[in-house]
Amino acid sequence: MKRPAQLVFVPAPGIGHIVSTVEMAKQLAARDDQLFITVLVMKLPYAQPFTNTDSSISHRINFVNLPEAQPDKQDIVPNPGSFFRMFVENHKSHVRDAVINVLPESDQSESTSKPRLAGFVLDMFSASLIDVANEFKVPSYLFFTSNASALALMSHFQSLRDEGGIDITELTSSTAELAVPSFINPYPAAVLPGSLLDMESTKSTLNHVSKYKQTKGILVNTFMELESHALHYLDSGDKIPPVYPVGPLLNLKSSDEDKASDILRWLDDQPPFSVVFLCFGSMGSFGEAQVKEIACALEHSGHRFLWSLRRPPPQGKRAMPSDYEDLKTVLPEGFLDRTATVGKVIGWAPQAAILGHPATGGFVSHCGWNSTLESLWNGVPIAAWPLYAEQNLNAFQLVVELGLAVEIKMDYRRDSDVVVSAEDIERGIRRVMELDSDVRKRVKEMSEKSKKALVDGGSSYSSLGRFIDKI
């Protein structure tokens, strides 16, 4: 009889990272009753603490909330990736202490009654904690919460810099088109991840990516049928440890049933596939000028809509968007009255439940990877409007590489002065809501493939089994 094993998961503090990490842990615990998992949770200074309310989580999964670390110039960090990496680094001593506290006595004795520490599973932004795993003489694995194409692009650029001596920032003029082996089509520099747009961020990002090679394997929240080209590229050489596509890892339950019920009742009254849903993630918000363009586009499109509209944090402050106290202060005069019979403007949105509702026919999205996987799972086509991080890359992949989305503005950056016109937004809404489009047909086919990937005999089911065998 094999001795039970314990894995320590360290997700980055963003809610999307934590949610997919929890789903990863649930999959592992469900597959092997000899696996025990401890999830170390870091709290962002401007966000609500994570609380586990999912009754379906195994008793073999334990959550430990780490003490808050002293912030280190967090408000002047240039992009979310750099912020997360610095934030995780500041928690290194707390991670070490937490692991010491959860180590079973059997690690100091020869008893086999308690789980042995088998390894760390680190978030894509937590690779600096490989040093801590080494102190405990256990291997590290990486959990890449984004897609295989982003992993491949980062790995490719890191190799160009470190092995070819190429200054990546010289390739990133806005008009350049790059040959990236993980993409079939030429890749426009205008849609590079935000962390590769200037010398300082690029250096920090690629230095971090180079640490991935020190892990024993990389779990990716994707599936073979969606990203076969990028996954085959990653498997084609020895530049990166073995990759295990284990997605889609999704939490399809609403976290606030009371708020969700009113929204879902409204959707119940709408015809099938008639509502376009606009939502831009936990960090997504727009200034007043852009909000008015969106409102104009919705009104002119004539489509029924459900719009999650969030207020931006104060200028220059790193904080989460919040709900408006009075929507009339930001929307065009009379908009709510004129659209009352066809639309609903909300704050927080139970996104998974909305995407799973039969009335939802299209999704105007920032193309965050969790949101993308939720939309594909439910067979809802996307109108791509990325905001930051690797979302521009995701949009390119969906629109150009895979034909699973239409474009609103693929090269949009939320920190730019660009205001997307109502005409461009309306055009995207009309296209994504076409009921007989090729995009909708492809999305429906991918929805079926995403569900098959997770069941016995599916590609991700088999890949997860190989990972369990390894640990």
UniProtKB/Swiss-Prot annotation:
Record EC number: 2.4.1.-
Binding site for UDP-alpha-D-glucose: 282, 348-349, 366-374, 388-391
Stored PROSITE patterns: UDPGT
UniProt key word Transferase: yes
Activity under varying temperature: Optimum temperature is 30 degrees Celsius.
Keywords per UniProt: Glycosyltransferase, Transferase
SUPFAM superfamilies cross-referenced by the UniProt entry: UDP-Glycosyltransferase/glycogen phosphorylase (SSF53756)
pH dependence: Optimum pH is 6.75.
InterPro entries, sorted: UDP-glycosyltransf_plant (IPR050481), UDP_glucos_trans (IPR002213), UDP_glycos_trans_CS (IPR035595)
General function of this protein: Glycosyltransferase that possesses chalcone and flavonol 2'-O-glycosyltransferase activity. Converts phloretin to phlorizin (phloretin 2'-O-glucoside), a potent antioxidant. Possesses glycosyltransferase activity toward, naringenin, naringenin chalcone, eriodictyol, eriodictyol chalcone, apigenin, luteolin, kaempferol, quercetin, isoliquiritigenin, butein and caffeic acid. Can convert phloretin to phloretin 4'-O-glucoside and phloretin 4-O-glucoside.
Protein family per UniProt: Belongs to the UDP-glycosyltransferase family.
Listed name of the protein: UDP-glycosyltransferase 71A15
Native species: Malus domestica (Apple)
Gene name per UniProt: UGT71A15
